[in-house]
Amino acid sequence: MKKIFFLIYIFLNFSFAYSENIELKSREDVEIENIESQIKVLEDKIQTIKKLKNNKNKDDLKVALVLSGGGIKGYAHLGVLRVLERENIKIDYITGTSIGALVGTLYSIGYSIDDIEKVLDIINVENFLETGSDTTNLPLDKKESLKKYSLYVNFDNELNFSLPKGLKGNRETYLVVKNLLKNYANIKNFDDFPIPLRIIATNLNTGETKAFSKGDISKILIASMAIPTIFEPVEIDGNTYVDGLVSRNLPVEEAYDMGADLVVASDIGAPIVKKDNYNILSVLNQISTIQSSNITKVSREKASILISPDVKDISAIDSSKKNDLINLGKVAAEQQIAKIKELPKSSSNRKIVKNIEDKKEKFVINKIEYNK
């Protein structure tokens, strides 16, 4: 009898041991293995990046300048630029959204800061204040009351009506920008500019951010500044685009994509403002601001140096405050001066294009090609 019990005991132990060896892999086991594999890949990648970072010479680091949108408050970017130039900081790449794209483009092709200021004067006084494009941070219910914002309805021959795509067209501003950039009209690849450039707009069909690196730069700039519901969207290569601030007002990620090691970001974006009363227009404006703020928060955290001019108390349509805005940009940059001084220095002077002689310059257009 004892032998029988002993044999049963041996058999059961063997069976249990064997069953453990043939245990089926569960879904959880597969997930654990996948995660562990991904962790291993990430750990290896981290170590590789650390080695690359340690082996890089400070003077070889690539620096990108990122300029956000913000209407007339874009004057503050000029104060930031003055500090960077004073410290002889090397700028290898530029990305910009809306008014930041305009400032960035002009700086990229060699405009002096003084001449960029003159350009903003031209755009703001002669075009933006007339057509509304300097009201980026103005609540839409205020925009609605502006004299130029008269809603119109189109009728066809059969009296079928349609609403406009925006309250204002953008052809006047397009022509002004086209004239300002006429010497660079033949350069279609923005990497061929003195400082490589990316201009940010939002694909209205998909909501995705588009970082333009080539094309009709004047048309792309207008797309980047096309405030939804205020300006007509701009069609480029079969896609419809609106203001870049809708999807990426502070394009830090795109700067890294260009190859930047360090990013200096100047953020003049509009804060979320609490309101007591809402109408349909102010609701749309608030939704846009909230969406932009949430995305910008992530971008701000990714910047190497974040410069945030305190422009919230200045009206988005008060161009008389331009000197205050420029000074606020300078003050904000000075607050980061210790970090700025650690950036790589430029080994040569930036080439400046011919100065603007007269901000009331007249120009004649013999041919206009603007595809809808």
Residue ranges and their predicted role:
Residues 18-97, 105-372:
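Patatin-like phospholipase
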Residues 4-13:
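Sec-dependent N-terminal signal peptides
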